[in-house]
Amino acid sequence: QQEFIDLKFLYVDSDSSVSYNPGFVTTKENLSSRIFKSIETYSKSPDINSFGGRLKYSKLLSVIDKVDTAITSNITVLKMRRDMVPAYGQLANYELCYANQFHADLEGFNIRSTSFKIAGVDGDVFLTDLPNSDGLTGVVRFFTLVDDVPNFINNNAGTVDYVKGEIILFAVNISSSSVTNKIEIEVIPESNDIIAKQNLYIVLDTTSGSKLTLLEDLVSVSYTHLRAHETHE
């Protein structure tokens, strides 16, 4: 008898700062478009799109670098995201598995979420984490923002297992969320090589979750002008 697995998506958001020599590209917009297209092509490759797929960080960097010889460097930061579907208006527990180890900065804020509302609490609520001193486990904390400063309203809203890559929320009555029908929960991975384990399927998000910043490499521009000057002497 065939067993049907409840497939869950593990989204990977990328934030890339790409330096380039503007003397070698037609327009900044054209370069940006080609970089996004290359990332999108990689996102659909068999490496990622399969059970047990793996997002290879070095491959992603290479994909960006190879778009144009004008690119001089790129710094790319990855984050993992699961979308939690709340049982609105009901007291419910939640479990989110990422199956990849979380980074555990002892100051916390390794986990971030979009906002939601809790019955009986005024204002928008967010969740984050605070690791225990061993960095292996920790707690989930709920907070609101007062003048852009976190105001913690629950310091024991759940547990975090940084090694397993697992978040558990204790019983909570979520009444609404800022994003339709879901709460996006983003985590910093310990390794930038992200593997689809268990019933997870990796999606390299090339839409709203990912960012691209293009920076003119002034050093390479100066070098190019210098070489051109030397050539004409």
What are these regions (language model features)?
Residues 1-51:
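Carbohydrate-recognition loop of C-type lectin domains
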Residues 12-14, 53, 107, 114, ...:
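Structural beta-strand/beta-sheet cores of well-ordered domains, especially the beta-sheet scaffolds
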Residues 30-123, 127, 203, 222:
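An aromatic-glycine-centered, glycine-rich loop/turn in mixed alpha/beta architecture
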Residues 46, 124-180:
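Extended, beta-strand-rich, solvent-exposed assembly scaffolds of outer structural proteins
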Residues 85-97, 157-202:
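Polar, low-complexity export/assembly segments characteristic of proteins
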Residues 194-221:
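Acidic/polar low-complexity flexible segments
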Residues 224-231:
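Conserved small/polar residues in nucleotide/adenosyl-binding loops
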